[in-house]
Regions:
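ABC ATPase nucleotide-binding domain
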Residues: 4, 25, 61, 332-334
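Short coil-to-beta microelement around the adenine-binding A-loop and adjacent beta1/P-loop entry
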Residues: 15-17
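ABC ATPase nucleotide-binding domains
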Residues: 31, 72-78, 82-229
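The feature captures the beta-strand-to-loop junction immediately N-terminal to the Walker
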Residues: 35-37
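Helix-to-loop junction immediately C-terminal to a conserved catalytic motif
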Residues: 50
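Conserved ABC transporter NBD signature motif
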Residues: 58-66
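Glycine/charge-rich catalytic "coupling/switch" loops of P-loop NTPases
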Residues: 251-297, 322-345
Length: 345
């Protein structure tokens, strides 16, 4: 792999281990996101790669070279933080040129590179402005241009969009993806925002408690989460206690049987399904059907969410607003076997 972390251990004191033997491989030109809740170790991982934190164990290699002990300023990576960290007393042009000037490059070369990247980032008109005269989105683009102009081997983005409003985040997301693909720069992106992460990444590492729970494409993680933690984190809300009867057939504690289109070889697992994927059963369906009683109803705008009490447990179900069910009404639910996913517990 172009970039790899092998067995990275980081602890801040003897008791608190932040990263536990973390492994991650990134191919050249990929955009890989580290996704997870606060405190899962995603920013620490990025800081190890940047060189701000020395791991207690493990190695970090880039393009075949061991970078574990290389100091920050010699790594020559592009960095963009949540706070942008622009120099307030320098114009956009000078902010972007800063990294090239510290590398003692020829003045004409610097000018050419800066003007090119300003053009790519849509900042040509703003070259003479100062940070305080600009909006958050413009500042973010300057921070990005400054990171990209040095033509880094690796671009590191630490929650770069979390200070922007929702509409701007969307357009910046598209912008980052476009720039990253156009320049072909290998990128590590830290975020806790699932939608942002899925829309921008080639691969996603979902982190929990200092380890990577699942590393896969956004589509695979969304459709087939590997563990209960990953499933809960990306929006699965229904979990059934299941025991294996035979391949593709599982039973709940109440004896009801469920067919699945997958099997898992592990001791502890659960069945999970999204509230959107449960349907009303018609008379034809025989398997994966549960009878239930409507409980609490919540209005979600496009749909209602019902809590339905069944013999296998309470299930959350999203249904259209054209028909409203009343509390206590009896209904039959159908759980399609290709939507019922088995996850490790």
């Amino acid at each position: 792999a172009f970039m790899s972390l092998n067995g990275i251990d980081v602890s801040y004191d003897k008791k608190k281990q932040i990263l536990k033997g973390l492994n991650l491989e990134v191919e050249e030109g990929e955009l890989v996101s580290l996704l997870g809740p606060s405190g899962c170790g995603k920013s620490t991982t990025l800081r190890v790669v940047a060189g701000f934190i020395d791991p207690q164990g493990g190695t970090f290699t880039l393009d075949g070279e061991d970078m574990t002990k290389v100091p920050v300023h010699k790594r020559q990576f592009g960095l963009v933080f949540q706070s942008y960290a622009l120099f307030p007393h320098l114009s956009v042009y000078d902010n972007v040129a800063f990294g090239l000037r510290t590398r003692k490059m020829d003045k004409d070369v610097i000018d050419k590179k800066v003007r090119e990247i300003l053009e790519v980032c849509g900042l040509t008109e703003l070259a003479d402005r100062f940070p305080k005269q600009m909006s958050g989105g413009q500042r973010q683009r300057v921070a990005l241009a400054r990171a990209l102009v040095i033509e880094p081997k690796l671009l590191l983005l630490d929650e770069p969009l979390s200070n922007l409003d929702a509409k701007l985040r969307l357009s910046m997301r598209v912008e980052i993806k476009r720039l990253q693909k156009r320049l072909g720069i290998t990128t590590l992106f830290v975020t806790h925002d699932q939608e942002e992460c899925f829309s921008i990444s080639d691969k996603v590492a979902v982190m929990n408690g200092g380890v990577i729970e699942q590393f896969d494409t956004p589509e695979n993680i969304y459709r087939r989460p590997a563990t209960e933690f990953v499933a809960r984190f990306i929006g699965f809300e229904n979990f059934l206690e299941l025991a294996k009867k035979q391949d593709g057939v599982y039973t709940a504690p109440d004896g009801s049987e469920f067919l699945t289109s997958m099997d898992l070889d592990c001791e502890k697992f659960a069945g999970t399904i999204r509230p959107d994927d449960i349907c009303l059963a018609d008379d034809v369906q025989a398997e994966n059907v549960l009878s239930g009683k409507i409980g609490v109803r919540t209005f979600l705008g496009k749909s209602y969410q019902y809590e339905v009490e069944t013999s296998a447990g309470v299930l959350k179900v999203n249904m259209g607003t054209d028909h409203v069910y009343k509390e206590g009404e009896e209904i039959r639910l159908y759980l399609p076997k290709d939507k019922l996913i088995l996850v490790r517990r």
